[in-house]
Amino acid sequence: MAAMASFGALALLLLSGLSCCSAEACLEPQITPSYYTTSDAVISTETVFIVEISLTCKNRVQNMALYADVSGKQFPVTRGQDVGRYQVSWSLEHKSAHAGTYEVRFFDEESYSLLRKAQRNNEDVSIIPPLFTVSVDHRGTWNGPWVSTEVLAAAIGIVIYYLAFSAKSHIQA
């Protein structure tokens, strides 16, 4: 009898574990993306990219684990406090962060595991379809004026001094 009770408890534990941990795929995802990229390279050391999305699925799946792929690099996607809100961020050196469009491919757990497997086996990863893709337009970073303000102020000061000195010399002559 005790063996039967422990078997029943084990079966109940196994079934409850499977029901809580089964990942359901998102059907027909609808996204509302927004993004931010660093535009000023003078005050920052790296260009930062932040993508926020609001995700709703036709089958009402919530709190999915998502992963992002940007140019072959994968990043975990964090869930926001609000249901269906997600965010991913990454940074690049200013030299590497060229102006243009960055394609951010989002994967669920199943497709992400296929992506990682393909990478480990040196297979073509472009055949693995993402759950959805967000295009991030980066306009590049501003590196400051061509001439620093200190040099410009010194040059203007020298020109004013020269004009004042020549006017004084012309008046005294």
UniProtKB/Swiss-Prot annotation:
Residue ranges that the UniProt entry lists as topological domain Lumenal: 24-144
Membrane topology: Single-pass type I membrane protein
Classification lineage: Eukaryota, Metazoa, Chordata, Craniata, Vertebrata
Location of cross-link Glycyl lysine isopeptide (Lys-Gly) (interchain with G-Cter in ubiquitin): 73
Keywords: Disulfide bond, Endoplasmic reticulum, Isopeptide bond, Membrane, Signal, Transmembrane, Transmembrane helix, Ubl conjugation
Subcellular localization(s) per the UniProt record: Endoplasmic reticulum membrane
Role of this protein: TRAP proteins are part of a complex whose function is to bind calcium to the ER membrane and thereby regulate the retention of ER resident proteins.
Oligomeric form and interacting partners: Heterotetramer of TRAP-alpha, TRAP-beta, TRAP-delta and TRAP-gamma.
Gene expressing this chain: Ssr4
Positions on the Cytoplasmic side per record topology: 166-173
Pfam families: TRAP-delta
Superkingdom to which the source organism belongs: Eukaryota
GO cellular component: endomembrane system; Sec61 translocon complex
Protein name: Translocon-associated protein subunit delta
Species of origin: Rattus norvegicus (Rat)
The keyword Transmembrane helix appears for this protein: yes
Classification via InterPro entries: TRAP-delta (IPR008855)
Membrane spanning stretches: 145-165
Stated family: Belongs to the TRAP-delta family.
Cysteine pairings via disulfide bonds: 26-57
Signal peptide positions on this chain: 1-23
